[in-house]
UniProtKB/Swiss-Prot annotation:
It catalyses: a quinone + NADH + 5 H(+)(in) = a quinol + NAD(+) + 4 H(+)(out). NDH-1 shuttles electrons from NADH, via FMN and iron-sulfur (Fe-S) centers, to quinones in the respiratory chain. The immediate electron acceptor for the enzyme in this species is believed to be ubiquinone. Couples the redox reaction to proton translocation (for every two electrons transferred, four hydrogen ions are translocated across the cytoplasmic membrane), and thus conserves the redox energy in a proton gradient. It is an enzyme of class 7 (translocase). It is found in: Cell membrane. It is a peripheral membrane protein. The lineage of its organism: Bacteria, Bacillati, Chloroflexota, Dehalococcoidia, Dehalococcoidales. This is NADH-quinone oxidoreductase subunit B.
Length: 200
């Protein structure tokens, strides 16, 4: 039932508006006296009708995070060039829901760290990581990010990003190809799908 006023709303008194609303509420209450049946009762062991999906809230949240990763840029060296190539039109990063790289960590949930990290830069990497909202994921790109790479023995180079921030996926290579980075993003998607959001 809808509110059908015989005269303009501005000319009605409050009592007339209350009567109309009361009628709508009463008709709604009389039509909704029993709870909706449990899906297991009306399915009777059959497949749900087209357009009906039975799932959990956790799976819906993971699905939405899976297709809306917002990466923050943290390009430190030559691997960042391959990260930029992946964002170009040839590899079409938009099909993964990642068409916009965020400049602010407060709007991102994936950090792609590409290149050689020095100890002088490490506190800033940690600070940007701490500013990202939960849940968040880190992707270490390249040999330098994985283990320090060619510069591992240098006094100023961090031998692996996992000494500064927790890393979810490593992409080997010097530099890794855009296809390898896309494979790593798909690995992060699989990790997101297995994430337990609700504590039991």
């Amino acid at each position: 039932m809808e509110l059908n006023f015989e005269k303009p709303l501005s000319l009605l008194t409050l009592d007339e508006i209350d009567q109309q609303e009361g009628g709508v509420i009463q008709s709604f209450r009389t039509g909704h006296t029993s709870p909706y049946p449990d899906p297991a009762d009306w399915l009777n062991g059959e497949e749900p009708p087209p357009g009906v999906f039975i799932t959990s809230v956790e799976k819906v949240l993971n699905w939405s995070r899976h297709y809306s990763l917002w990466p923050v840029m943290f390009g430190l060296a030559c691997c960042a060039i391959e990260m930029m190539c992946m964002a170009a039109s040839r590899w079409d990063l938009a099909r993964f829901g990642m068409d916009i790289f965020r400049a602010s960590p407060r709007q991102a949930d994936l950090m792609i760290v590409a290149g050689t990290l020095t100890w002088k830069m490490a506190p800033w990497l940690k600070r940007i990581y701490d500013q990202m909202p939960e849940p968040k994921w880190v992707l270490a790109m390249g040999a330098c990010g994985t283990s320090g790479g060619l510069f591992r023995d240098s006094y100023s180079v961090v031998p692996g990003f996992n000494l500064v921030v927790p890393v979810d996926v490593y992409v080997p290579g010097c530099p890794p190809r855009p296809e390898a980075l896309m494979r790593a993003i798909m690995d992060i998607h699989e990790k997101i799908d297995k994430t337990c959001i609700l504590k039991r």
